[in-house]
């Protein structure tokens, strides 16, 4: 596989202290205007600790890291071996911090983008049967 390089500029970072929050960099603070507590957002993260040539070549994984699950393409899983979108609920906004319940990312993970998540446009009816066959 040959990869073409391009640059992604982080707009903030995941922080895990007493609370979990997204710290938006000062130069992107204006982009938070209109975001309200209770809004759902979609985060685009860069799993910087999984960014190696070897891990980038992984295209199939066992979901949930369980070898009893069949090998599945990474785009059909939540594997951390490439950038993943996550959805979290905004609980509180203070200055350049967006507080959230939890996130499956490490402290210091770069946030590439944040988008409002209007359910009526982005959330099709859930079909839980497609993942119910997988083992945790």
Swiss-Prot record:
Keyword annotations from UniProtKB, A to Z: S-adenosyl-L-methionine
Cited CDD domains: UPF0066
Chain residues that bind S-adenosyl-L-methionine: 48-49, 78, 106-109
SUPFAM superfamilies: YaeB-like (SSF118196)
Stored PROSITE patterns: TSAA_1, TSAA_2
Keyword Ribonucleoprotein annotated: no
Pfam families reported in the protein's UniProt record: TrmO_N
Keyword S-adenosyl-L-methionine: yes
Domain TsaA-like: 8-126
Family: Belongs to the tRNA methyltransferase O family.
NCBIfam families per UniProt: tRNA_TsaA
Protein name in the entry: Probable S-adenosyl-L-methionine-binding protein PH1056
Species of the source: Pyrococcus horikoshii (strain ATCC 700860 / DSM 12428 / JCM 9974 / NBRC 100139 / OT-3)
């Amino acid at each position: 596989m040959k990869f073409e390089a391009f640059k992604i500029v982080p707009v903030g970072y995941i922080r895990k202290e007493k609370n979990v929050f997204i710290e938006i960099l000062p130069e992107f603070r204006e982009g938070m205007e209109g975001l309200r507590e209770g809004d759902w957002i979609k985060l685009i993260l860069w799993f910087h600790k999984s960014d190696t040539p070897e891990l980038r070549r992984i295209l199939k994984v066992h979901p949930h890291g369980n070898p009893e699950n069949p090998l599945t393409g990474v785009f059909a899983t939540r594997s951390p071996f490439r950038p993943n979108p996550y959805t979290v609920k905004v609980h509180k906004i203070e200055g350049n911090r967006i507080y959230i319940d939890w996130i499956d990312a490490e402290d210091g993970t770069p946030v590439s983008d944040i988008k409002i998540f209007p359910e009526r446009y982005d959330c099709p009816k859930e079909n839980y049967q497609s993942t119910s066959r997988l083992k945790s």
